[in-house]
Swiss-Prot record:
Record-listed (6S)-5,6,7,8-tetrahydrofolate binding positions: 113-116
Record's GO cellular component terms: cytosol
Keyword S-adenosyl-L-methionine recorded: no
Stretches assigned to coiled coil: none
Entry protein name: Methionyl-tRNA formyltransferase
Family matches, as InterPro entries: Fmt, Formyl_trans_C, Formyl_trans_C_sf, Formyl_transf_N, Formyl_transf_N_sf, Formyl_transferase-like_C_sf, GART_AS, Met-tRNA-FMT_C
HAMAP family from the UniProt entry: Formyl_trans (MF_00182)
GO MF, one example: methionyl-tRNA formyltransferase activity
Disulphide-bonded residues: none
A UniProt-annotated Pfam family: Formyl_trans_N
Gene symbol of the encoding locus: fmt
Enzyme class of the recorded protein, top EC level: transferase
Domain of life: Bacteria
Amino acid sequence: MSDSLRIIFAGTPDFAARHLDALLTSGHNVVGVFTQPDRPAGRGKKLMPSPVKVLAEEKGLPVFQPVSLRPQENQQLVADLHADVMVVVAYGLILPKAVLDMPRLGCINVHGSLLPRWRGAAPIQRSLWAGDAETGVTIMQMDVGLDTGDMLYKLACPITAEDTSGSLYNKLAELGPQGLITTLKQLADGTAAPEAQNEALVTHAEKLSKEEARIDWSLSAVQLERCIRAFNPWPMSWLEIDGQPVKVWQASVIEDATQSLPGTILAATKQGIQVATGKGILNLLSLQPAGKKAMSAQDLLNSRREWFIPGNRLA
């Protein structure tokens, strides 16, 4: 490849590994891979390598796992690779300005939203939570701000009524590598056209928490159904019954008006468990009691009908 670039790749989860895999078949020269240190995982808390490390070692690439890139000796690891560009995908560490300035073409990042909408940690989840009609990926030039750099390339993706964060993650993991390879070609041949972000259109994708995922029946059924899809597969929307957390995997919206207080169980049938909300009715379709597998509302009613007596209120 005549316009082959020397690339440092920095990333950690599976989403990042899919981008590294695309780079390795693109004709560019990946000269080093940075990923987060091995972390304890599973019941035995055994140290586990990141998906990016697993792929990099499988391909015989040099792997670096600093806890931080602030120390001078760790920055020197980057400098010694003499890269044309550093590609950053869900790395999880802050890149100091000294590192951002090292590669000839700077550092670029693959972000899971159509910037400037949803800067921050949870862009995929927040696009669902807000009811956006579309999302996508943005390849941007990195600067010292949080997702504030100039945009180099964007690819859009429609959000369907069935999408969860899990399904949208997979869609963007397919789109991202396409955009990345196109952007690298433009950088290599000098045709990249950076575009500044419109600050008037900025929204922030705050991190998710388990407490936020607790179902608040005062919200509308439409908003709660969005939350259930946005928080799937993590942290999972949940409610509490008899002191036990019950996860909600799937629900639908019934637009009918109700005079019942939010959280009131209106009906419990094989078609679902219908609960009054701040506006409309939420029909619970798939739930998971603590220590059990996810099951249909009908199966849960067969074993725990006393949990869902019409007229009772859910907390």
